[in-house]
Amino acid sequence: MKAVRVHAFDAPPVIEEVTQPVLRPGRTLVRMEAATVGHIDRTVWRGSFLKHPPFPYTPGVEAAGVVVASAVYASGQRVWLRGSGLGTLFDGTWCELIDAPDEALGLLPDGVPAAIGAAFFSPSTSAWVALHDVARLSAAESVLVTGATGAVGSLAVQLALDAGADVTALVADAAQAARMPSGAKVLVLGNEPGSSMDSISADLLVDTVGGGVLAAALARVKPGGRAVLVGYTAGNTLTLDIAHFLQRDVSLLPLNMFRREPAGRAAAPDLLARLADGRLKLDVQPFALESAAQAMDWISQRGHRGRAVLTMGR
């Protein structure tokens, strides 16, 4: 079967023929239909993750497909896959057939396309857990979301609106502003992030980008408010004036989805139902399995919309 293989940190991913897996106890054989290319895959590939599979390895933490053989799932059932060491401890999902740990699978409703099933878990559960488990969002609170056209940011905007919050979405330009859902206030980020946000005051900040944008957005959180830190694509450092920070009394709340994955899995069926009936929308950008390197490059570019997904041709 075909699989994407990585032979060294930062080495270009290549397509190779590898031996097909066989069914083992505690595992399910799944024919892949779509596999996500995410920032965690890049982190492992660059050698910046805490662990990595032995070289050469097949990347891929998330995917969707159809069960071929299992002691737990019926043959032909549609499933999504995520975590349990996939792509971080052993070979992952960028392949045609995988033997995945049974606990990594969840049922995928018929109304959800495979590409969405592969891509939904990380951004939708991150947004849900950030708002409801970490921040404890209440209806009618004001919420500022940075990186609002990214996968997590866009879903945070949608879920906060659905919860009855007053939402302001921070975007990079007018073209991105036009893509925001109705009901959200939209603020275009200028060359000076701080001055762009002068008119904003929020009970809760959901920051998906980090860096200078986070520093500027923190100043717009009301005293006693909260800031959930989700991502760092714009920079992984934050400098604080401690005296000023103590006076403002804003709680900095990190989102660690490895620790909170049980909460994400509990929310997954409801989130999939919302994606199936259109209450939630998630953009995906398809790439062929052979184009994994291009997909890795695409997600590294600022301003990309949605998630990259490798699709397996029949």
PLM regions and their residue ranges:
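NAD(P)H dinucleotide-binding glycine-rich loop of Rossmann-like/cofactor-binding domains
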Residues: 81-147
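Mid-domain Rossmann-like dinucleotide-binding core that forms the NAD(H)/NADP(H) cofactor-binding site
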Residues: 118-191
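C-terminal hydrophobic helical "lid"/dimerization subdomain
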Residues: 1, 263-314
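Short amphipathic alpha-helix with an adjacent loop that forms part of the alpha/beta core around
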Residues: 192-200
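N-terminal Rossmann-like NAD(P) cofactor-binding module of classical short-chain dehydrogenase/reductase
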Residues: 205-206
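NAD(P)H cofactor-binding loop motif with strongest signal on the N-terminal glycine-rich segment
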Residues: 147-148, 209, 232
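Glycine-rich phosphate-binding loop and adjacent beta-alpha segment
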Residues: 163, 212-279, 312-314
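Glycine-rich beta-strand-centered segment in the early N-terminal region that forms part
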Residues: 21-37, 48-86
